[in-house]
Amino acid sequence: MRKTIVIHVDGLTGRSFPELGNQTLLQSARTPYLDHLACHGELGRLGVPRELRRFSGEMALLAFLGYDPHKWYTGPGPFEGVSMEVVLDAHDVAYLCHLVTLRGEDGWGDGKKLGSQLFMADPFGGGVDTEDARELIDTINEQLVSENIQFYMGHHHRHLMVWVGGSSKVVCRNPQEALGQPIDTYLPTGDGAQIVRELMEASRPILCHHPVNQERLNGGLKPANCLWLWGPGKPVELPPLKERWPGKGTVISPDGPYVGVGTTAGLQTVKVENAGEGDIAWLQALAKMTSTALETQDLVCVHVPFYAWLMIDEQAQPPTTLVEYLERVDEHVIGALEQSCTAKGSHRLMVMCTPFPHQQEDGAAAMSPFLVFEGENGNPEHPHLTFSEQEAANRPLRDATKLFERFTADK
């Protein structure tokens, strides 16, 4: 069976930058390994026909594994629950429950009411660590838990809320969308939204006056002073991948919902720690982990969450810095794994790049370019081809849900 590596660079495409001459990051960065693979492989663009939700994150992995998101993707919440080993009943609704930092016009805004007077200062709760978060979530559980509402401890700012028999029709927004903005237009709406808002508002006085946050303020840190509930969904039971494919596979990612998709499909999973600011050592370790896993696995999907590096300490990273991060990914992940595939001779390498899931996109930049490298094929037909959104735009849209079937049919 031919072995396959899938590298998913998530949150890379999505916009062009005036500072880069209105080019995208892929156009501006020096990416010799990606360009070489594009010249010697198949270049195209991925998506799911008739799917209006953005093709990125765990939904992109779900589609690649051959599961139609129209049928199987209800939201990130239940897959986060799987990664946390939380057992959900059929009528439960799982919400991502993030600790965030809200700021008022004259301070941190101690008032309970959520509205236009509060701004999203930090969607990551001021970088709260897991030890502090545990004390905060424990207190939330003591005061807000009920027969129908349950909170589960995760890591850092990321946790889970389960609404037993609740509504999955609430329209929620990722807190990253609201960064630096008044939160009123980002609050939950729709059927059941009032209950979700009330829980978020009830968390405010509990967290604002918690000793952990008082210590954080005294130490010059931002308080994790509100729960933000989003990403609701009911649990899904995916048909096991082994019913369609006899091989063994592994998913490697720092992202809970992404890992949850792999687990639900019956793959092995490795959840790694997040890396700050495109850390080279982390990227090198990720490539080594992938190469090692392929020694015993037939498929390894490795997730590079580029979106996590777009904002650092409430500030958008300069485009030139993002270009540097992309060049690191090209060298230390894609280049390293290309060399590994070439050394083995018969391995397949796929790279897919998807848009940042929570920002306004523009034109061709919003698409998801991909390439498949089956090995050197002599002199390429297009020796000067580069891997970019603009090059992929000239190719027809490929249905992501059909790729896995194609790969597994090729022995």
Language-model features: where?
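Feature captures the catalytic ectodomains and active-site-proximal regions of enzymes
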Residues: M1-K411
